[in-house]
A protein has these predicted regions:
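Short beta-strand/loop motif that positions the catalytic acidic residue
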Residues: 156-157, 162-165, 169
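Short, conserved loop/helix-junction motifs that constitute active-site signature segments
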Residues: 15-16, 153-158, 184-189
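Conserved alpha/beta-hydrolase "acid-adjacent" motif
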Residues: 170-179
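Catalytic nucleophile loop
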Residues: 2-4
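Alpha/beta-hydrolase-fold enzymes
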Residues: 6-124
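Active-site nucleophile elbow and catalytic-triad environment of alpha/beta-hydrolase enzymes
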Residues: 134-153
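Histidine-bearing beta->alpha loop at or near hydrolase active sites
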Residues: 168, 192-201
């Protein structure tokens, strides 16, 4: 979304166009090195996602009646991709606690505090993302529109762009984020940078 917003602002010559943009592990072009997540998105029609993954928030919760992709379902999907890794991490946590290795235990606890911090996604946002990003690849194919106008990333000429990817990322694989550099065709080389972090997933 930040890439699209920057492109729209650049096309409008908006005075608040950002000076820099950092893209971290966000899918710009899902055709590159498709992952299990990409395969799931392309193997099912959008109606499947609406039927199987969207729920209504129950009463008396504050957002009751709202249709969402629940955080607990997102988390279950993430964990199910690498169950052995998560099981091993919790075994290590237990071992560190038993052996009094508090610093090591705290690292694992801190990671999972962040990992488990997921929010419900609204139905509209989630289904649009699946359709437009993962199924139709609208941005890299030049088909994404904002208020009826095609989004043209070549309009980005003043915003420096840094892309960051993890070598072992199995959700947004190597190349899917750095594909942004292929879209900003008029951005000068000194305003582009890419970082691939080895061993990170």
């Amino acid at each position: 979304q930040s890439t699209v917003a920057t492109a729209v602002m650049a096309a409008q010559k908006h005075p608040c166009e950002p000076r820099s943009l950092t893209l971290m592990a966000g899918p710009i072009d899902c055709r590159i090195n498709p992952t299990t997540v990409n395969k799931l998105a392309t193997d099912h029609p959008i109606e499947w996602f609406q039927t199987n993954l969207i729920s209504t928030v129950p009463f008396p919760l504050p957002a009751w009646g709202r249709r969402v992709y629940p955080g607990f379902m997102q988390l279950a999907a993430f964990v199910s991709m690498n169950p052995e890794r998560h099981l091993d991490a919790h075994k290590s946590l237990f071992r560190h606690l038993v052996e009094g290795e508090d610093d090591e235990a705290e690292k694992i606890k801190t990671f999972y505090d962040e990992y488990f911090a997921v929010l419900d996604l609204t139905e509209e946002f989630y289904l649009e993302t699946v359709a437009w990003v993962f199924q139709e690849m609208r941005l890299p194919l030049g088909r994404l529109k904002h208020r009826g106008e095609l989004v043209d990333c070549s309009k980005i000429t003043r915003t420096a762009i840094l892309t960051v990817e993890g070598e072992r990322d199995d959700i947004c694989s190597v190349g899917q984020t750095s594909a942004a550099h292929e879209l900003v065709t008029k951005l000068r080389p000194h305003l582009r940078s890419h970082h691939l972090q080895p061993g990170v997933g």
